[in-house]
Amino acid sequence: MVERKASVERNTLETQVKCSINLDGSGKARFDIGVPFLEHMLDQIARHGLIDLDIECKGDLHIDDHHTVEDVGITLGQAFAQAIGDKKGIYRYGHAYVPLDEALSRVVIDFSGRPGLQMHVPYTRASVGGFDVDLFQEFFQGFVNHALVTLHIDNLRGHNTHHQIETVFKAFGRALRMAIEQDERMAGQMPSTKGCL
């Protein structure tokens, strides 16, 4: 099997991001981003997606977290697009429901080649540990725009904002794992009647 790995660097006047991934990993993760709550959520993607992730970012955190969070999403999306290759033989679609106490979230993904995000998370607080939760919209928008996926995220219930967000990221990791899995019956075939994605 071809190794599905990628390393991407993205440098702007606002951030310098390095991202390495292995889609067929074991969930190992290392982060040096400077935004602890984001790192905690990225760890959920690695662990539940069985994706090895190594991300470093030096950003303009003296202003706020916005550019760092968005650019990490963009760079992760670029790494996914590179590592997934031509998409032959993958399941393409993935979905997951994940609970955490009172919270329940659903994530559905399609490696369609068409970027689109529908995200409905009615946060009960504006921040968690000083982190502006609205920035997760920017993270996922950056990811879908560059991974070229369609992504639906719904928090179905929950009143603890940390739990709401954590269920989203765990479900995202599990949906990714399902979608990128190699389907032996589709080996070498494109999972689309168009013949391309």
Curated annotation (Swiss-Prot):
Q: Which UniProt keywords apply?
A: Amino-acid biosynthesis, Cytoplasm, Histidine biosynthesis, Lyase
SUPFAM superfamilies to which the protein is assigned, alphabetical: Ribosomal protein S5 domain 2-like (SSF54211)
Which ranges of the sequence are coiled-coil?
A: none
Per the record, the pathway is: Amino-acid biosynthesis; L-histidine biosynthesis; L-histidine from 5-phospho-alpha-D-ribose 1-diphosphate: step 6/9
Its chief place of residence is cytoplasm
Q: What class of enzyme is it?
A: lyase
Q: Which reaction does it catalyse?
A: D-erythro-1-(imidazol-4-yl)glycerol 3-phosphate = 3-(imidazol-4-yl)-2-oxopropyl phosphate + H2O
Q: Which domain of life is it from?
A: Bacteria
Its localization reads: Cytoplasm
Q: Which Pfam families does the UniProt entry name for this protein?
A: IGPD
Instruction: Please list the GO biological process terms of this entry.
Output: L-histidine biosynthetic process
**Residues in the signal sequence:** none
- GO CC aspect terms: cytoplasm
What GO terms are given for molecular function?
A: imidazoleglycerol-phosphate dehydratase activity
- According to its UniProt record, the EC number is 4.2.1.19
Q: Which PROSITE patterns match?
A: IGP_DEHYDRATASE_1, IGP_DEHYDRATASE_2
Q: Which cysteines are joined by disulfide bonds?
A: none
| Protein family per UniProt | Belongs to the imidazoleglycerol-phosphate dehydratase family.
Name under which the protein is recorded: Imidazoleglycerol-phosphate dehydratase
Species this protein is from: Pseudomonas entomophila (strain L48)
Lineage, please?
Bacteria, Pseudomonadati, Pseudomonadota, Gammaproteobacteria, Pseudomonadales
Q: Which gene encodes it?
A: hisB
